[in-house]
Curated annotation (Swiss-Prot):
Its EC number is 6.1.1.17. ATP binds at K239. The gene is gltX. It comes from the Bacteria. Its cofactor is Zn(2+). It is found in: Cytoplasm. Keywords: Aminoacyl-tRNA synthetase, ATP-binding, Cytoplasm, Ligase, Metal-binding, Nucleotide-binding, Protein biosynthesis, Zinc. GO terms for cellular component: cytosol. One of its GO terms (molecular function) is glutamate-tRNA ligase activity. This is Glutamate--tRNA ligase. It comes from Shewanella putrefaciens (strain CN-32 / ATCC BAA-453). It catalyses: tRNA(Glu) + L-glutamate + ATP = L-glutamyl-tRNA(Glu) + AMP + diphosphate. One of its GO terms (biological process) is glutamyl-tRNA aminoacylation.
């Protein structure tokens, strides 16, 4: 049997990291077993579902590279199918119309609560004969009486629910709209889903869904209910812990490879290995290796992984993601070095692509002023001679290469009998406007000859004015 999994988010908000991890685990289960992965949008909550949320989910999945083989399917486009099955169930007697009023249901719950009883429907309409009436009704599934529902969860082991603890679930509301728990069952059946990977908050839905599947004569998929993700303070991950939207991590400068690597390790492991390529994830992933204990989100670990991937992935590839941040920060990359060269130069220092973009601005744009603190420290009178001599050395170069630039700076320090810092720091502030950059040779090379010479002249003028003031 072909493995077939699905990711089925509700479009009531963005794709958060918990959902992204579930999608990743489901995707890996399919890919590790040469199976198929389905994307399904569960939009039966019509009032809360939005097109913007749908778009955000698709954008997040595409950015992560979690491609799907089927879909996206939308539940709101399958209402005819759900109603067809409901009609069949009413005909077979596995479902029934319930005419109980809201007032009766509320009174029942109040009475049960007062008596310390579990709050559930009492089956009042379960065995009533059919009515020819215009009274409003819901449709309820006729849940089995007695016995239990047992399933082996890949994460949590054997789970058992008593049928006596389950009431007759509403599968269609008074307006005729089918309910979430019913739509899920029909979808999983129609789409041939063999393994359901989802959050632990769905565990209580599982026995109800299994009973409906049995009533339909449909196969029962395997289940894996993964634990929640906690913040570093032990509370459930929420907005107050920082970014929880997948695309917020994109905006903050993380590579998809870093986020995927981090998410896969939030509950799953393979020995002591920390860094996994997507191919390695597919090779090693097994649902049975997922830990059932909650996992705590650690941003420092994500930053470490992001640094690793910025440094080790192909600079040309990293540059494609960096371009988004350059555009976002309104840096025109057409007037300067190739972005891949900038990635190579700055990768060792960068924690995020957002940070890398900000620190590379001087390669593409002239700055109005020198950093005040750095200028005060390094563009003093003693810097005039080193700047003038290095300017002469650079102007005399027959070729603008990293090696030639390095030699010119080195010769300047040698001729003046000073340490490299006495030349390097004033020169760095001169060409970048600040006090940090990669090696000066690669920095000047990437800035370009004309722009470098203009900036050094500007710094010499700045120092001269300072001497004369």
């Amino acid at each position: 049997m072909t493995t077939k999994t699905r990711f089925a988010p509700s479009p009531t908000g963005f794709l958060h990291v918990g959902g992204a991890r579930t999608a990743l685990y489901s995707w890996l289960q399919a890919r590790a077993n040469n199976g198929e992965f389905v994307l399904r949008i569960e939009d039966t909550d019509i009032e809360r579902s939005t097109q913007a949320a749908c778009d955000a989910i698709l954008e997040g999945m595409n950015w992560l590279g979690l491609t799907w083989d089927e879909g996206p399917y939308y539940q709101t486009k399958r209402f005819d199918r759900y109603n067809e099955i409901i009609a069949q169930m009413l005909e077979k007697g596995t479902a029934y119309k319930c005419y109980c009023s809201r007032e009766r249901i509320d009174a029942l719950r109040e009475s049960q609560a007062a008596n310390g009883e579990a709050q559930k429907y009492d089956g009042c309409c379960r065995d009533l004969p059919a009515r020819d009436t215009d009274e409003p009704f819901v449709v309820r599934f006729k849940n089995p009486i007695g016995g239990s529902v047992v399933f082996d969860d890949h994460v949590r082991g054997r789970i058992e629910f008593s049928n006596d603890a389950l009431d007759d679930l509403i599968i269609a509301r008074t307006d005729g709209v089918p309910t979430y728990n019913f739509c899920v069952v029909v979808d999983d059946w129609d789409m041939g889903i063999t393994c359901v990977v989802r959050g632990e908050d769905h565990i209580n839905n599982t026995p109800r869904q299994i009973n409906i599947l049995k009533a339909l004569g449909a196969p029962i998929p395997e289940y894996a209910h993964v634990s929640m993700i906690l913040g570093d303070d032990g509370a459930k991950l929420s907005k107050r812990h920082g970014a929880v939207s997948v695309m917020q991590y994109r905006d903050d400068g993380y590579l998809p490879e870093a986020l995927l690597n981090y998410l896969v390790r939030l509950g799953w492991s393979h020995g002591d290995q920390e860094v996994f390529s997507l191919e390695e994830m597919k090779q090693y992933f097994k649902l049975d290796d997922i830990n059932k204990a909650p996992s705590a989100f650690n941003t420092d670990k994500l930053v470490w992984l992001n640094q690793h991937y910025i440094k080790t992935l192909d600079p040309e590839y990293v540059a494609t993601h960096l371009q988004w941040h350059m555009d976002d920060q309104k840096i025109d990359t057409s007037n300067g070095p190739a972005l891949a060269e900038v990635v190579t130069a700055l990768a060792e220092r960068a924690k995020t692509l957002k940070e890398l973009a900000a620190s590379s601005r001087y390669f593409y744009e002239d700055f109005a002023d020198f950093d005040a603190e750095q200028a005060k420290k390094h563009l003093r009178g003693v810097a005039l001679e080193p700047l003038q001599l290095v300017q002469q050395k650079l102007a005399a170069l027959t070729e603008w290469t990293v090696e030639a630039i390095h030699l010119a700076i080195e010769q300047t320090a040698t001729e003046l009998d000073v340490g490299m810092g006495k030349v390097g720091m004033p020169l760095r502030v001169a060409v970048t406007g600040a006090g940090q950059s990669p090696g000066l040779d690669i920095t000047l090379f990437l800035i370009g000859r004309s722009r470098s010479e203009q900036r050094i002249s500007k710094a010499i003028e700045f120092v001269a004015d300072r001497i004369n003031s």
